[in-house]
């Protein structure tokens, strides 16, 4: 085991750099992101639609929520086209330094980022999650993509979140049963078609409250396909938790 003197000397010779902006991190800093990048993240919080997690909700919804003790109504998008899941939460907006950090995790193998990003999701969203969650289920990657990358970022995030929430992680409860194109270059309609029927859930989800975990919510097509597979296998309640979400102009 290295002595504290040796560790300090190595920090001086080979200083750790922030994976986003390449600023030198302070000696002994455990967080792999620098303070400036961490502080620049635009965090999300209530008021939000309880179904899709979009924030902010409309003023009319806030007024109705204040007047009534009944469960709040969904946003207009969820009312007209309800998703397959029951509720969704995202910690922050997918932009700037958070986008770069997620890219560094996924595409540059910076696995250490899974811990602070998982903490971000937990700290920002845990208080608004319903109780009684039986398991966290990470969104599975295609087998060849996971083999090529060496890991599934959603599993890394789920492990950290599960540790913080004291909820078990069950990656075997959901499988990707066919390969799909990368979603990034597809339209919303193409994304839905691309992942339709791509997932199958274990019958172990029957009558369970499961929380899907992923890194980013973009159009929701992948998460909706996962939720449909879980619902078909008998899941009683399905939630979604992501580190980031794309905020569309229509939200």
Model-derived features: positions:
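Glycine-rich phosphate/pyrophosphate-handling loop used in enzymes and phosphotransfer proteins
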Residues: 1-214, 218-251
């Amino acid at each position: 085991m290295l002595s504290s003197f040796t560790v300090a000397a190595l920090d001086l010779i080979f200083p750790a750099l922030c994976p986003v902006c390449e600023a030198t991190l302070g000696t002994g800093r455990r967080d792999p992101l620098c303070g400036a990048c961490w502080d620049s993240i635009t965090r999300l919080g209530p008021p939000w639609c309880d179904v899709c997690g979009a924030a902010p909700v409309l003023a009319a919804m806030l007024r109705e929520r204040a007047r009534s003790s009944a469960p709040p109504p969904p946003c207009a998008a969820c009312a007209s086209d309800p998703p397959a899941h029951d509720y969704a939460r995202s910690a922050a907006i997918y932009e700037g330094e958070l986008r770069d950090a997620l890219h560094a995790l996924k595409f540059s193998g910076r696995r250490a980022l899974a811990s602070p990003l998982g903490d971000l999701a937990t700290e920002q969203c845990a208080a608004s999650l319903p109780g009684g969650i039986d398991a966290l289920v990470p969104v599975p990657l295609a087998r060849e993509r996971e083999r090529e990358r060496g890991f599934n970022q959603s599993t890394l995030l789920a492990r950290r979140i599960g540790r913080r929430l004291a909820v078990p992680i069950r990656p075997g409860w959901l499988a990707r049963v066919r390969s799909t194109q990368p979603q990034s270059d597809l339209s919303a309609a193409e994304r839905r078609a691309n992942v339709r029927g791509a997932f199958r859930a274990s019958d172990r989800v029957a009558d369970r409250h499961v929380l899907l975990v992923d890194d980013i919510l973009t159009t929701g097509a992948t998460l909706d396909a996962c939720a449909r597979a879980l619902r078909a296998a008998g899941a009683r309640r399905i939630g979604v938790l992501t580190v980031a979400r794309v905020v569309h102009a229509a939200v």
